[in-house]
Design a protein with these regions (language model features):
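Extreme N-terminal starter segment of soluble prokaryotic enzymes
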Residues: 1-5
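Class I SAM-dependent methyltransferase "Motif I" SAM/SAH-binding loop
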Residues: 8-12
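Gly/Ala-rich phosphate-binding loop of Rossmann-like dinucleotide-binding domains
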Residues: 20
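S-adenosyl-L-methionine
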Residues: 37-61
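Conserved acidic E/D residue at the C-terminus of a beta-strand in Rossmann-like folds
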Residues: 30-34, 97-98
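Class I S-adenosyl-L-methionine
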Residues: 56-64, 71-162
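Short beta-strand element of Class I
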Residues: 25-27
């Protein structure tokens, strides 16, 4: 049986492709921007639900092993909405991907909230160029929250050599 994931703020499909390559089944993807959804559907032959994090009813999100939130283009209120969804449903594992600057605020304000929900948290800051073949200089925080020991989580590693 495959592991399953729900993708929030699916963008053009980068997280989806990453999870598919890791052997996960994508149960559902959400994306608020209709133009971006068109690109996503060109990249990945899967339907996307057009809605923002603030408009998702937690009861309608499928049960899955992982909830993955792409918050790389988000503001702080998107973090709030993602945590509201998590609080209502408490999935087994959560992945947050966000710009390094947003992570600094996230840890100060929300890390204890996740711990109160029973999550163990680990994170790593990763340069985009380390995990893609593109010469990008953006640094992102990958935050894994798991309701069991987080020490067995594997962080992304470089897959493309120059």
């Amino acid at each position: 049986m495959k592991n399953t994931v729900v993708i929030f703020n699916a963008g053009i499909g980068a997280l989806t492709l990453g999870f598919q390559n890791a052997g996960y089944e994508i149960l559902k993807a959400y994306e608020p921007d209709r133009k971006v959804i068109e690109i996503y559907q060109e990249n990945i032959s899967q339907n996307v639900t057009a809605c923002s994090l603030s408009s998702i009813d937690p009861a309608t999100v499928p049960d899955s092993d992982v909830w993955a939130f792409d918050l790389t283009q988000s503001k702080a209120e998107e973090v709030f909405y993602s945590l509201t969804l998590v609080q209502r449903r408490r999935p087994p594992a959560i992945l947050f991907v966000m710009k390094k600057q947003l992570w600094k605020g996230f840890i100060k304000e929300h890390i204890f909230q996740l711990q109160e929900y029973g999550y163990h948290i680990t994170h790593k800051n990763i340069q985009s160029s380390e995990v893609t073949a593109f010469p990008l200089r953006e640094e992102f925080a990958y935050i894994v929250s798991k309701r069991v020991n987080a020490s067995d989580m594997i962080m992304p590693v470089q897959v493309h050599k120059e």
